């Protein structure tokens, strides 16, 4: 669904764990990382699109997550000119996104990047809450900053446990 201004309707998904970290996924066969996202189909609500994309991209079902909140408005970003497909009609110049903040209720093992026949991601990890703002591709950075700022109080209030410290092995001599 591309609107009259050339923006494609899209949903973005931020999944947080009980440590206040967020899921960060690497695009299949690329070096770029991002949050799961995807288009809203004709006749589909933003929430319906979010659940469909959640399963297609990371293999999670509604019972695996709790929806904590969503953005108050649609956030937009423009694609760089090199990524705009001028031969497609209508021309899509960017995305308008409704974002959802989810809390993972299940174990990490429920995440399955190959749940659909065409994986979007080939790796994922938990990262600190603000990490994605600095790491996402530059043309998405402003939207990421806005959504992370809007969700911060909610996301960080659901941190129920401290991140386990990695055990460091002591070298023994002798």
UniProtKB/Swiss-Prot annotation:
What cofactors does the UniProt entry give for this protein? a divalent metal cation
What Gene Ontology terms for biological process does this UniProt record contain?
mRNA catabolic process
Keyword Hydrolase annotated = yes
Return the InterPro entries for the record: Nudix_hydrolase (IPR020476), NUDIX_hydrolase-like_dom_sf (IPR015797), NUDIX_hydrolase_CS (IPR020084), NUDIX_hydrolase_dom (IPR000086), RppH (IPR022927)
An example Gene Ontology cellular component term from the record? cytoplasm
- Write down the EC number: 3.6.1.-
Q: Which PROSITE patterns match?
A: NUDIX (PS51462), NUDIX_BOX (PS00893)
User: Where is the motif (Nudix box)?
Assistant: 38-59
Kindly indicate whether the keyword Protein transport belongs to this entry: no
Specify the Nudix hydrolase domain's residue ranges: 6-149
Using the record, list the residue span of the signal peptide; answer none if the entry has no such feature.
none
Alphabetized UniProt keyword annotations: Hydrolase
Known Pfam families for this protein? Answer: NUDIX
Q: Which family does it belong to?
A: Belongs to the Nudix hydrolase family. RppH subfamily.
Outline what the protein does: Accelerates the degradation of transcripts by removing pyrophosphate from the 5'-end of triphosphorylated RNA, leading to a more labile monophosphorylated state that can stimulate subsequent ribonuclease cleavage.
- List, alphabetically, the PANTHER family matched: M7GPPPN-MRNA HYDROLASE
Concerning NCBIfam families, the annotation shows: PRK00714.1-1, PRK00714.1-4, PRK00714.1-5
**What is the protein's given name?**
RNA pyrophosphohydrolase
Specify the species: Shewanella oneidensis (strain ATCC 700550 / JCM 31522 / CIP 106686 / LMG 19005 / NCIMB 14063 / MR-1)
